[in-house]
Amino acid sequence: MPPVCGRRCSRTGEIRGYSGSIVRRWKRVETRDGPRFRSSLAPHEAALLKNLAGAMIGLLDDRDSSSPSDELEEITGIKTGHAQRPGDPTLRRLLPDFYRPDDLDDDDPTAVDGSESFNAALRSLHEPEIIDAKRVAAQQLLDTVPDNGGRLELTESDANAWIAAVNDLRLALGVMLEIGPRGPERLPGNHPLAAHFNVYQWLTVLQEYLVLVLMGSR
């Protein structure tokens, strides 16, 4: 069985990823134009990131293109989003409700209706810009992933976009894997979703390493 993502190599300190991939550390280099963040990807890792990001952009495009239009949008140019939460579970994870009070009583219809109405207004107003931000980050990742793998160098803006986009990819995969706040940490090798879980873990470590080097910790 290939190494499970998240297992550290004792000799190199690198983290082994899905199907034996290795999450390579990022290196921060100071230049006249600001910091640069360097690493490398294997060809199959680059292809995976491109496929996942492309699929996520497609989901967001579908959601955006189906949003309602109204007279106010035509007059002001301010886009109106959906008032209702997405039906697709992956989109619900990417575009969650904006507001839920800690003391909300689900058995109180009046309180629930008030919360849903407030969420609908916030979603209609803010969802379009959130979709745009997620698409921009995912597209920035696509634009900076080397086509056939190999070395890559990110600006600080690129690095922040990668962190946001990879986090969204993890959220999307987490829906398929039904991952909650506490795990699971790994799946048996014969589990039907073991390969997807290994990808999820690989993305987690990739994101963690980039966050650390961006903060100057590594």
Curated annotation (Swiss-Prot):
The keyword Plastid does not apply. A motif (CXXXC) lies at residues 5-9. InterPro entries: AosR. Keywords: Activator, Disulfide bond, Redox-active center, Stress response, Transcription, Transcription regulation. The keyword Amino-acid biosynthesis does not apply. Activity is modulated by the formation of a disulfide bound within the N-terminal Cys-X-X-X-Cys (CXXXC) motif. This intramolecular disulfide bond is formed in response to oxidative stress, and results in oxidative stress-dependent interaction with the sigma factor SigH. Disulfide bonds join C5-C9. Disruption phenotype: Deletion mutant shows no growth difference in vitro in nutrient rich or limiting media, but its survival is compromised within peritoneal macrophages at day 4 post-infection. Mutant shows a marginal decrease in the survival upon exposure to nitrosative stress and markedly compromised survival upon exposure to peroxide radicals. Failure of the mutant to upregulate cysteine biosynthesis during oxidative stress generates a domino effect, causing differential expression of 6% of M.tuberculosis genes, resulting in attenuated survival. Changing C5A: Forms dimers independent of the oxidizing nature of the environment, but cannot interact with SigH and cannot rescue the growth defects of the deletion mutant. Belongs to the AosR family. Transcription factor crucial for intra-mycobacterial redox homeostasis and protection against host-derived oxidative and nitrosative radicals. In response to oxidative stress, interacts with the ECF sigma factor SigH and, in conjunction with SigH, binds to an auxiliary promoter upstream of mec-cysO-cysM, leading to the transcriptional activation of these genes encoding a non-canonical actinomycete-specific cysteine biosynthesis pathway. Increased transcription of mec-cysO-cysM results in enhanced production of L-cysteine and cysteine-derived antioxidant molecules. Homodimer. Under oxidative stress, interacts with the extracytoplasmic-function (ECF) RNA polymerase sigma factor SigH. This is Oxidative stress regulator AosR. It comes from Mycobacterium tuberculosis (strain ATCC 25618 / H37Rv). The lineage of its organism: Bacteria, Bacillati, Actinomycetota, Actinomycetes, Mycobacteriales. The gene is aosR.
